[in-house]
């Protein structure tokens, strides 16, 4: 896709009615078919009477502004990444999700929660639903803080290092190597693990850590200083004080949707790069960071999203939050830049609301 510098507000305000109409038709044609629109086709589509020559003059002006480009000689025009962003910001109208689509989401996700299946089942169904309705890849992930603890163990590896093992409520296992306080004994390792296990009672990492912080005096009376230090180190690592510890569960459904309508080797390479990106844990942690940085649905087009910039993909993502307004996960759709943004944005927003409500019930 063509790339140019961002369009300033002053430049955008210079577009007259026919320029805006021609630009809008080019973008909508691209989002609908992926094909460029030429001057003859545009002259027939426009509500005003303009000759193909007049349309070409307007297209030339739009090209100078960096809003459209020609993919090859004698072809029609396609929107640049800057053009798509301008369209999303200035033209796109996002309304409420239609009642039938809300009902469809409720029908697909609701029964999973109603039958008290695992949170894993809820995540899977939400991802599958987003994929099916958007024709992109549906993505649902959770932050590590949302994992409910079942068992904790510390296994000494070296005098100054131990393997910290966490088992979640769905038997998912996380291993982390942690630095041990100097001089801590094997019995103190066991004491620290037993203390955590005795206080779990179905709490998340963040809840357990908060409890320990508010009951520091009681903690000091029950544990020695070294064991207390170890407990706090283990919880800090698991609860995501470092970036690696932030990601909990990830489910992506609908990768096959991204293979539909590929036109050539370049498109195949683009999708292959996207698949590779989805396997990198650091990229998925960044998705959580992107979701946390905004209060609602966020749209990242092409290289605006450094995660998937090489594959020329767009990401529409929204966080979902717990009762204390902490981000505990994100839902989204990944696909080509010609996603139906106006339709997918309210879909992702509504799904995030549903996930926030249902995930609390799963706790």
From Swiss-Prot:
Annotated keywords: Repressor, Stress response, Transcription, Transcription regulation
Highest taxon, organism lineage: Bacteria
Matches recorded under NCBIfam families: hrcA
Organism: Agrobacterium fabrum (strain C58 / ATCC 33970) (Agrobacterium tumefaciens (strain C58))
Family membership noted in the UniProt record: Belongs to the HrcA family.
Pfam families noted in UniProt: HrcA
One GO-annotated biological process of the protein: negative regulation of DNA-templated transcription
Name by which UniProt lists this protein: Heat-inducible transcription repressor HrcA
PANTHER family linked: HEAT-INDUCIBLE TRANSCRIPTION REPRESSOR HRCA
């Amino acid at each position: 896709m063509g790339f140019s510098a961002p369009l300033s507000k002053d430049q955008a305000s210079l577009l007259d009615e026919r320029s805006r109409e021609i630009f809008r038709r080019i973008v909508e044609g691209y989002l609908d078919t992926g094909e460029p629109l030429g001057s003859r086709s545009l002259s027939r589509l426009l509500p005003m009477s303009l000759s193909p020559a007049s349309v070409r003059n307007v297209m030339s002006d739009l090209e100078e502004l960096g809003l459209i480009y020609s993919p090859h000689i004698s072809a029609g025009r396609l929107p640049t990444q800057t053009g798509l962003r301008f369209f999303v910001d200035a033209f796109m109208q996002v309304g409420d999700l239609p009642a039938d689509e809300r009902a469809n989401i409720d029908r697909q996700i609701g029964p999973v929660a109603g039958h008290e299946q695992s949170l894993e089942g809820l995540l899977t169904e939400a991802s599958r639903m987003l994929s099916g309705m958007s024709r992109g890849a549906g993505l649902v992930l959770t932050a590590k803080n949302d994992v409910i603890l079942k068992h904790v163990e510390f296994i000494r590896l070296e005098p100054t290092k131990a393997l910290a093992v966490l088992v979640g409520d769905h038997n998912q296992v996380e291993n982390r190597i942690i630095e041990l306080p100097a001089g801590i004994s094997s019995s103190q390792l066991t004491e620290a693990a037993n203390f955590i296990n005795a206080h779990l009672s179905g709490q998340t990492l963040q809840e357990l850590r908060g409890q320990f912080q508010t009951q520091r005096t009681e903690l000091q009376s029950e544990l020695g200083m070294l064991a207390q230090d170890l407990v706090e180190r283990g919880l800090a690592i698991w609860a995501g004080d470092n970036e690696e510890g932030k990601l909990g569960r990830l489910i992506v459904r609908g990768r096959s949707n991204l293979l539909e309508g590929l036109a050539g080797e370049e498109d195949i390479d683009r999708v292959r790069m996207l698949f590779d990106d989805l396997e990198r844990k650091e990229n998925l942690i960044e998705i959580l960071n992107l979701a946390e940085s905004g209060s609602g649905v966020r749209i990242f087009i092409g290289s605006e999203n450094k995660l998937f910039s090489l594959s020329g993909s767009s990401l529409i993502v929204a966080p979902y939050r717990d009762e204390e307004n902490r981000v505990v996960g994100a839902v989204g759709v990944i696909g080509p830049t010609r996603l139906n943004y106006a339709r997918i944005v309210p879909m992702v927003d509504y799904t995030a609301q549903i996930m926030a409500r249902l995930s609390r019930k799963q706790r």
